[in-house]
Amino acid sequence: MSPKRRTQAERAMETQGKLIAAALGVLREKGYAGFRIADVPGAAGVSRGAQSHHFPTKLELLLATFEWLYEQITERSRARLAKLKPEDDVIQQMLDDAAEFFLDDDFSISLDLIVAADRDPALREGIQRTVERNRFVVEDMWLGVLVSRGLSRDDAEDILWLIFNSVRGLAVRSLWQKDKERFERVRNSTLEIARERYAKFKR
């Protein structure tokens, strides 16, 4: 029996996936400032025409790449939340989830694009939509867990802000300073403070 032929939609998805993966590679190597859309087709192993068909502009390719990054992280957060048990340490899980996102090697790519978006309204609008569909959704899911465990919405938001903003700050600091021992101390201090606040707020 001959293998089943792929549909046009399947072939299109495969090509788009190759282009996004190649765009990520270029961003990792050269950053936003050095990103050239002309470098992507060759790295992806597709023609320039195929790239132009799926992502006619640099903006469209960058936004698709940014969205793919955030969707992968969102799915990992959903999986973590789905496995969460009543007896689990929710504060530890939140910290681990934040670290998986903000301390991932590719966070610097998203940060680079976010900074660039400050000078590009179209890029900023697209990034904002992706953040709202992904990071805000993840935060709302964690807030729902905290509220279900007896915290008010305001208290839950305080804890989420404490954890996520602390880890985000460590991620930004790591761009110019590597101090693993201090990072661990600050991370453990964040965990300790958040646990204390959780115990205090829990009804």
Swiss-Prot record:
Residues 13-73 form the HTH tetR-type domain. It holds the Pfam family TetR_N. Induction: Induced by p-cumate. GO terms for molecular function: DNA binding. InterPro entries: Homeodomain-like_sf, HTH_TetR, Tet_transcr_reg_TetR-rel_C_sf. Residues 36-55 bind DNA. The keyword Transcription regulation applies. Keywords: DNA-binding, Repressor, Transcription, Transcription regulation. Involved in the repression of the cym and cmt operons which are responsible of the p-cymene degradation. This is HTH-type transcriptional regulator CymR.
